[in-house]
């Protein structure tokens, strides 16, 4: 059966997460329902990452197997038609090898987290940022973030229900960026690794916020990491503000990615 990769963008607010759940709205369920309107189902799609409730997607990648030989552009157009009015869009589609897998073929995942610093309630960015009413020291946060780079046992920074076989991961990037947006001053976190533990990024951000607020010193983050104890973690920040921004593969999958790489 022909296999297709889909690049997916979605607003996570109305969904119970990516993964299909009985009697609850999910991004996976929305796409599988749209696929069933193109070809008889049932259809099951696999994704590079299963984002939690309220987490958004800018560059999620999934794959599906279809019986018909679709032109990728027409496939994306047809899916987008049937996905309306839900806040889910297929921004690209590509034919891939039958053994290509959205999750297992991926070599890296990149997340973005937006933290807005202002006292007035966010209106246009409501649900798209984590908002705090105080300023944060981005330099101190970066100093603490640097201590987390590399290969470590991240037991402190994973949820108690994490199903990963090992807490050891390699963190390739954790960059703290101060940005002046139209809504106000933001801190943006750029986080990149081959794979992540459950709630790892939100645990990082919640802990680093404490550093930026002056409640923790950067060295306290090192102590928390070395404790290998969930109780040593700072607060876990809320899901709004977190985006799965990009998934990387050994070779570019979509036409726009191939053009950028050449």
From Swiss-Prot:
Transmembrane segments: none annotated. One of its GO terms (biological process) is tRNA pseudouridine synthesis. GO terms for molecular function: RNA binding; tRNA pseudouridine(38-40) synthase activity. The active site is at 52 (nucleophile). Gene3D superfamilies: Pseudouridine synthase I, catalytic domain, C-terminal subdomain (3.30.70.660), Pseudouridine synthase I, catalytic domain, N-terminal subdomain (3.30.70.580). Substrate binds at residue 111. It comes from the Bacteria. Keywords: Isomerase, tRNA processing. It catalyses: uridine(38/39/40) in tRNA = pseudouridine(38/39/40) in tRNA. The keyword Iron does not apply. Its EC number is 5.4.99.12. Homodimer. Belongs to the tRNA pseudouridine synthase TruA family. Formation of pseudouridine at positions 38, 39 and 40 in the anticodon stem and loop of transfer RNAs. NCBIfam families: hisT_truA. This is tRNA pseudouridine synthase A.
């Amino acid at each position: 059966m022909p296999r297709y990769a889909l690049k997916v963008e979605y607003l996570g607010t109305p969904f119970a997460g990516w993964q299909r759940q009985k009697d609850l709205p999910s991004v996976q369920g929305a796409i599988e329902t749209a696929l069933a309107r193109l070809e008889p189902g049932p259809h099951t799609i696999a994704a590079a990452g299963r984002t939690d409730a309220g987490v958004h997607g800018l560059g999620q990648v999934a794959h599906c197997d279809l019986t018909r030989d679709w032109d990728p552009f027409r496939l994306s157009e047809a899916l987008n038609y049937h996905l309306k009015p839900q806040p889910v869009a297929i921004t690209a589609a590509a034919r891939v090898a039958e053994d290509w897998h959205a999750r297992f073929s991926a070599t890296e995942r990149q997340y973005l987290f937006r933290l807005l610093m202002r006292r007035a309630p966010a209106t246009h960015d409501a649900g798209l940022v984590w908002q705090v009413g105080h300023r944060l020291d981005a330099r101190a946060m970066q100093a603490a973030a640097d201590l987390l780079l590399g290969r470590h046992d991240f037991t402190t920074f994973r949820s108690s229900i994490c199903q990963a076989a090992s807490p050891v991961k390699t963190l390739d990037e954790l960059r703290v960026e101060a940005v002046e947006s139209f809504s106000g001053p933001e801190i943006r976190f750029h986080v990149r690794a081959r794979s992540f533990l459950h709630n790892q990024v939100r645990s990082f951000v919640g802990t680093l916020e404490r550093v930026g607020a002056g409640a923790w010193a950067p060295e306290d983050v090192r102590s928390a990491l070395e404790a290998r104890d969930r109780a040593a973690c700072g607060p876990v920040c809320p899901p709004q503000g977190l985006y799965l921004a990009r998934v990387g593969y050994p070779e570019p999958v979509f036409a726009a990615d191939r053009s950028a790489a050449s």
